[in-house]
Amino acid sequence: MNILRLLLVASLLTSLVTTAQENDEKLDALVDSVVAAYGGDALLELRNVEIKQRYLAPNTGQSWSPSLTSIARSNQHLVHDMESGNVYSENWFIGSGAVFPGLTIVNGDNAWALNLQTNRYGDAPSADPYVIAGGTMRTSDVLLAHELHKSRADAEYLGEAFWNNRRHDTVKMPFPSSPDLTLYIDTETGLITRMVRENPQFGQLDYVFQDHTETDGLMSAQRVNFSIAGAPNLLGVSREVRFNQPLSASLFELPPGFEPEGERIDTSELVVNRLSKNVYHIGQAIGYSIFVDTGSEVIGCGGYPGLTQRLERFREESGSHRPLRYQVVTHHHSDHLGGIDEALNLGATLVTVENTVPAIEAASQLAPESSRFLNVNSRMTLGQGDGRVELYDVSTVHSESNLLFYVPSSRTLFLADHFGGPYAKGTPTANANTVSMAQALEPLDLGFRKIVTAHNARVYSNGDFEDSLKSYRDYDCPDDRPMCSQ
């Protein structure tokens, strides 16, 4: 009997080893076919890439109204010198009646975030090319093929799949500063036609590559579309890709006429702002919450993922272990709903406006009952005394409904998405959202003295807000920035 068991185990182990060997052989052959399909030596000797991409951008989960998806434009210009690691990453978002520019330059160990509206610059959050430009890199099937070759020892053959009415092989591969990617490789052509990866908050992200043509000796998709959980997010309109072209060193240098912005706040660890004895602003990176201890319970606002961790830090700092009774949801945008299930698991009632409830229900995995919601009609007061919180529903160009969270005892206003910046000092750059929020605040006459936000670590004064508004200028596409206007 024991001999029989040993034989069965040995047979099973042999089968597993054989299968693993077969998959390794398939993977090697598949990677070789991808390299050949994309240009062979031309791919292996890739030195630099330049991508100019224009998209239509359905504002999935980010529209002005939760009931209608608005359409914006998103234009991207990436130059990546793979030999030096230098990066030029220019982005333009044109929507909500305004232009939102972004430019980051990486030059060796230096990395700068440039404000094209004010001609000022500060340190970028990282000098890692994959952190700065990984999002655009993943839209290039050529760069995916190049990374697959580099990481073949760590890649995994997953099996066959049927995609877009054609046979494919699927491979899981690592990608720097990202969850693993799954590539769909056309079995006949060796070309990558799809890539998927998982986002812990938004679900499956899909990249679809079409219309492959030869450019500078390499095959490259001329049309790229990107979807979030099955909903279109970026729809390719035009795409120009060049490889191994001469690059000017000046492209990766600070342009003339830019002045330093100041020191960036370190948000790599949780930041704690004590606003008064019972009011705290706590967060990390780009997700922050405000907590108010009413004396019998806690009222919170700011719904990025990590809410539980922020609440625990509040309890450590304040010594208050009262329950989170209310979690205020500012608006329907999907990035602000990532902590919804944490709030529900903590036992909180979700305070919001009626038209935000469907977005919350869609974002939650817990199917919250109607009793877990408390809807605001124009305005509402929670708590009393030093723990009094006033909520006001206002409309701006950013969102049809925005709940303002105001604490009269500390004269503190909590905002999401309308104001702020990453720097410790100086005047934050106002945009159309800021101006629209100021117009909504004026008739409320709140008398706030401090502003904290859902995305920034700094505590702002009302003077910072006023200075930002005074420095605001309408911003249109500059003549010397064709990626914006075309």
Residue ranges and their predicted role:
Residues 22-29, 105-180, 187-189, 199-200, ...:
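Flexible, processing/modification-adjacent segments and terminal tails
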Residues 163-252, 408, 416, 421-422, ...:
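Gly/Pro-enriched, hydrophobic low-complexity segments
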Residues 7-15:
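Bacterial N-terminal signal peptides
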